[in-house]
């Protein structure tokens, strides 16, 4: 992941500074700029079909920052904030699968693949987008491609995205007893309404 950020230039410094603050990892924050959007209440869910029982969880504490002028984005997901229907399933998820005390956050940094075209047409209509970036989960980082939409609505940047991941790719160990009864791929959905960042200096305590 370090190499990817380095190759993206200094623009990532603006993105990751606010993201760290939103995720509760940094102190005072100063942000300048136009066309930049943030949220700390993004929504993410995942679903995996299973013969034994479908696995589904939701999280409304996603921190995200999007630089609309460059097409770069980043988000951070607190793993322990995923909510399940069953408490026991949530405990297994955190303790046995995700090891959330050791790996408390999942992160993504990416770039719109067709940024120039999207940014030109975005003010007038919802745009289908493709994002390529680095997803870090359970301490493992992989390059992923994500499909979604962008829309400017009521002074907010509305983001929808969807992609699939394979837990095995991120060294998430599923017990042998249930391995054959759980889908090899997990469907992920993301929904965020990001507020514009004021062009003046923003400082948070």
Question: Which residue ranges define each predicted feature?
Answer:
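Intrinsic low-complexity/disordered segments
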Residues: 7, 29-31
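Bacterial N-terminal signal peptides
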Residues: 12-28
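Low-complexity, acidic/polar, glycine-enriched regions of mature
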Residues: 31-205
């Amino acid at each position: 992941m370090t190499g990817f950020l380095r190759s993206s230039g200094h623009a990532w410094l603006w993105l990751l500074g606010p993201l760290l603050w939103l995720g509760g990892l940094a102190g005072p924050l100063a942000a300048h700029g136009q066309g930049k959007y943030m949220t700390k209440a993004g929504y993410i869910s995942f679903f995996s079909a299973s013969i034994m029982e479908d696995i589904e969880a939701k999280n409304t504490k996603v921190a995200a920052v999007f630089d609309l002028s460059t097409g770069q984005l980043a988000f951070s997901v607190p793993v322990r904030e995923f909510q399940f229907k069953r408490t026991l399933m949530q405990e297994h998820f955190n303790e046995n699968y995700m090891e959330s005390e050791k790996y408390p956050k999942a992160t993504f940094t990416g770039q719109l693949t067709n940024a120039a075209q999207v940014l030109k047409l975005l003010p007038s209509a919802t745009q289908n987008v493709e994002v390529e970036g680095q997803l870090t989960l359970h301490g493992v980082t992989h390059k992923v491609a994500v499909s979604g939409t962008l829309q400017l609505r009521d002074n907010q940047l509305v983001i929808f995205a969807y992609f699939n991941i394979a837990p095995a790719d991120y060294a998430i160990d599923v017990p042998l007893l249930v391995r054959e009864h759980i889908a090899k791929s997990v469907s992920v959905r993301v929904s965020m309404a990001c507020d514009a960042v004021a062009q003046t200096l923003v400082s948070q305590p």
